[in-house]
């Protein structure tokens, strides 16, 4: 999707000598590098809450140092970051939501259910709340709520009950412990479909640890506030919960505010934004496999 993201942002960045683009999830710097190479006059602000990723992107983007500003922050802070830099608005914003393959591959960070690791899952290692904080302290009801809402897991109550039992017995110390608890909580017929049975619970705990959906809900309206006239916002979402939020915010932003029954649409009621295309586009099989 990298080339497609660059193409979608292109109309806002082409033939501009003063355009600023925000890569709100700069990660390893791949999308940022593609944008900087394609549009030699733009300046880029790269934001990431993951310090490890930010340092790697610094290396990736070292040839563009004079045009790049890297910030350790969450993307809901975009307006404050721009104000600090003296920037009133930007021509483009790119979001690549969810977890990265780099984070999954670093087994010690606890994002993977296939390798024994501490119960961490923090994207920002300086945050105080980890997966262990949640798993060891949340009530059964709160655990079930998180797993059901953020993992869309129909066996959430049973999983939560078994987590509480395991922690009381001192048998919940690692990611593989959690994965085994989840597996034992799901009936055998249900385990045979949908991939690893721990996937949904790990997603749910990770989202709760990092407050991913709450931050996204705050960030998108703020992104709309700082985008310039004829600017573009591109969002890559990976799962249905993110996708739902993005579609809801964009649908509201592109809707006329004209009262029902008014014979004509007044200028002040017109939508301030329009969708570049309706619906969504799908990554190819290779990228989907890498993201998993």
Where do the protein language model's features map onto the residues?
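S-adenosyl-L-methionine-dependent methyltransferase catalytic core, i.e., the SAM/SAH-binding region
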Residues: 1-292
């Amino acid at each position: 999707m990298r080339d497609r993201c660059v193409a979608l942002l292109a109309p806002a960045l082409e033939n501009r000598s003063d355009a600023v683009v925000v890569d709100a999830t700069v990660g390893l710097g791949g999308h940022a590098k593609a944008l900087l190479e394609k549009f030699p006059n733009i300046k880029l602000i790269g934001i990431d809450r993951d310090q490890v990723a930010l340092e790697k992107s610094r290396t990736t983007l070292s040839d563009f140092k004079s045009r790049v500003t890297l910030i350790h922050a969450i993307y809901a802070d975009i307006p404050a970051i721009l104000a600090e830099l003296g920037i009133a608005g930007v021509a483009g914003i790119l979001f690549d939501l969810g977890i990265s393959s780099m984070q999954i591959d670093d087994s010690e960070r606890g994002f993977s259910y296939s390798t024994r690791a501490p119960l961490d899952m923090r994207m920002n290692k300086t945050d105080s709340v980890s997966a262990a904080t949640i798993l060891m302290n949340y009530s059964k009801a709160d655990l079930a709520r998180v797993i059901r809402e953020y993992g869309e897991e129909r066996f959430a109550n049973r999983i939560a009950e078994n987590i509480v039992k395991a922690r009381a017995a001192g048998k919940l110390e690692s990611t593989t412990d959690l994965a085994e608890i989840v597996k034992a909580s799901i009936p055998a017929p249900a385990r045979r479909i949908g991939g690893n049975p721990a996937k949904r619970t790990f997603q749910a705990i990770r989202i709760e640890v990092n407050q991913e959906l709450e931050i996204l809900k705050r960030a998108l309206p703020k992104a709309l506030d700082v985008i310039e006239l004829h600017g573009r916002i591109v969002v890559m979402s990976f799962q249905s919960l993110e996708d739902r939020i993005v579609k809801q915010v964009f649908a509201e932003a592109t809707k006329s505010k004209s009262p029902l029954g008014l014979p004509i649409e007044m200028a002040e009621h017109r939508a301030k934004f329009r969708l570049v295309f309706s619906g969504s586009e799908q990554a190819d099989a290779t990228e989907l496999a890498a993201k998993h």
